[in-house]
Amino acid sequence: MRFSLHPLSTSDLKALEASQFPEGFSGRAVPDSMPPAFVASRALQLEAAAEAPPVPTSYLIVRLEDSRFVGACGFKTGLGERRVEVGYGVAPSAQGQGAATTALKLLAEVAFSSGSTEVLAEVAPDNIASLRVVQKAGFVLVGERRDEDDGLVTQWVLRSGA
């Protein structure tokens, strides 16, 4: 299957922050494909902190065969920084089809074209599916840290030109 990214506008993120579907999205979204309200809120804060974001910071993952939204992904830190952090999630019904791997590769392209040289993804060591995603996308394990919310996470980096 093939996938692409659909950028989320500020108005889309505001609707998601209010736990509502953005206009025109409800018929295209598979169950559990929309980002949670706290993710939309973080994206709005990130966009507000940037004077004028050159590119969107948040995206929906689109399955091209039927144009349905199957997940979401985006940047957790500002584009243009040397290292940017990304996050992603795919609806259970669409997992195992390459959506997250493709989305991660496309996010890395956006990051590198915006001046970043490294993309960071943090993954819980027991999240086998996500560990496979970062490995398939070309990320390399560089360390681990204890997150106050998520506990132990492994840190995976993809460098520009890798």
Range-by-range predicted roles:
Residues V119-V123:
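Conserved hydrophobic beta-strand within the GNAT/NAT acetyltransferase core sheet
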